[in-house]
Curated annotation (Swiss-Prot):
This is Ribosomal RNA small subunit methyltransferase A. It is found in: Cytoplasm. It comes from Psychromonas ingrahamii (strain DSM 17664 / CCUG 51855 / 37). The gene is rsmA. GO terms for cellular component: cytosol. Keywords: Cytoplasm, Methyltransferase, RNA-binding, rRNA processing, S-adenosyl-L-methionine, Transferase.
Length: 270
């Protein structure tokens, strides 16, 4: 049996599959999630059920979204959990998470995310932030560093700003490659994201905030006045209180929101 086969299933590279098997890490993650019986909880990419089984044992019902139809079928036939699982065979990047949430029962989301889609998947989930109470994800350690970064460091980028706009970010634990089969070539980490009921800084238009961040970080080595020159003049940036000699990685989340709100007001007043 090669090192890509675990519990009779061969990991598929196109799905970014690395199966967690370390009991200590599994127990630590489940402890961090702390599932409760009545939770409205969903797992993305349950795989072979390393997290599915212990979480499902603590809740009334567990929603799972699995792209791999073989793994979805395997879970449906699980001798113990089959009746507890609400299984959707689908691409989480296209899935409407709003269908699973309600005002009374916001979603709790967790998963060992495929590293090849983790960033776009988080951006997709941010669209449902008002319907989610918390998220626990296993990610590439580099991505967790980006989520937690502050201004003035290399890890700080568009993902940082958007994640910290929507959520409080809490690192949980680091995970070595040996905890997986097959072992990835990178270190991993678990992170908790708690969407704010009300963000600390309110963007008038999320579309404008996304546009500003994209423009700034697409040219991150340029000063902010050059990176955003198609949107705002030096004088306008100075009017907002932005140091125009700074680069994208030196601008705080609050400052990005202020820039986006200024851009929005300009468009509204045209």
């Amino acid at each position: 049996m090669n090192d890509k086969t675990h519990l009779g299933h061969t990991a598929r590279k196109r799905f970014g599959q690395n199966f967690l098997h370390d009991d200590y890490i599994i127990d630590s993650i489940v402890g961090a999630i702390a599932p409760q019986w009545e939770d409205n909880i969903v797992e993305i990419g349950p795989g072979l059920g390393a997290l599915t089984e212990p979480v499902a044992s603590k809740v009334k019902c567990l929603n799972v979204i699995e792209l791999d139809r073989d793994l979805a079928a395997r879970l449906a036939e699980h001798p113990v959990l089959g009746d507890k699982l609400n299984i959707t065979q689908a691409d989480a990047l296209q899935f409407d998470f709003g269908k699973l949430a309600s005002t009374e029962r916001p979603l709790r989301v967790f998963g060992n995310l495929p590293y090849n889609i983790s960033t776009p998947l988080m951006f997709h989930l941010f669209e449902y932030a008002d319907k989610i109470s918390d998220m626990h994800f296993m990610l590439q350690k580099e991505v967790v560093n980006r989520l937690c970064a502050g201004p003035n460091c290399k890890a700080y980028g568009r993902l940082t700003v958007m994640a910290q706009y929507y959520c409080r970010i809490i690192p949980v634990l680091e995970v070595p490659p040996t905890a997986f089969k097959p072992a990835p070539k990178v270190d991993s980490a678990v992170v908790r994201l708690e969407p704010y009921d009300t963000p600390p800084f309110i963007a008038k238009s999320l579309k404008c905030l996304t546009q500003v961040c994209s423009m700034a970080f697409n040219q991150r080595r340029k000063t902010i006045r050059n990176g955003l020159r198609d949107l705002l003049s030096i004088e306008q940036l100075q009017e907002i209180g932005i140091d125009t000699t700074k680069r994208a990685e030196n601008i705080s989340v609050e400052e990005y929101v202020n820039i986006a709100n200024y851009v929005f007001d300009l468009k509204e007043n045209k």
